[in-house]
Every structure is written in C-alpha cells, then in structure tokens.
C-alpha cells in the first residue's frame, strides 16, 4: 500500500506502508477556527479522533490525498 505523506505546492510525497499497516489516514487538526493542520500517513488501525480532530481512513493507494 502506498500512502500520501505530504502534499504541498511542490507536489506530493508518498511512503510505502510497512507490513501490518494496511490503511492510509488523513487527519485535520484545528489550530484556530478556520485553520487546520493536515497529517497523512500509514496506520494499522484508524486513529481515534481527539480534540475535535477529523480523521478519514481508506485502503487503496494514495487514497488519502
């Protein structure tokens, strides 16, 4: 499985997930109202949302773009 690690104006950085990590995730963490920090990567299980974060998980290549 290949997941997106970073997305910027310079392009997309991907990572090949190690064995046992069969999900890609994308997390939005609110810094201040209207401003979010996005985190992407591989995971074995879908992370649990904390502090009003929004998390999406998926299981196909680059699905967390």
Curated annotation (Swiss-Prot):
Regions that span the bilayer: none
Any coiled-coil regions, as ranges: none
Tissue and organ expression note: Expressed by the venom gland.
Compartment(s) where it occurs, according to its Swiss-Prot or TrEMBL record: Secreted
Organism whose genome encodes this protein: Naja kaouthia
Additional facts recorded: Negative results: has no effect on ligand binding to any of the mAChR subtypes at concentrations up to 1 uM.
MF-aspect GO terms: toxin activity
Gene Ontology annotations for the cellular component aspect, listed alphabetically: extracellular region
Subunit details: Monomer.
Keywords for this protein: Disulfide bond, Neurotoxin, Postsynaptic neurotoxin, Secreted, Toxin
Protein name (record): Muscarinic toxin-like protein 2
Family: Belongs to the three-finger toxin family. Short-chain subfamily. Type C muscarinic toxin sub-subfamily.
């Amino acid at each position: 499985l290949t997941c997106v690690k970073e997305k910027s104006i310079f392009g997309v950085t991907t990572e090949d997930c190690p064995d046992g990590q069969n999900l890609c995730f994308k997390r939005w963490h609110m810094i201040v109202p209207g401003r979010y920090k996005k985190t992407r990567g591989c995971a074995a299980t879908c992370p649990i949302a904390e502090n009003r974060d929004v998390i999406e998980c998926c299981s196909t290549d680059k699905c967390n773009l």
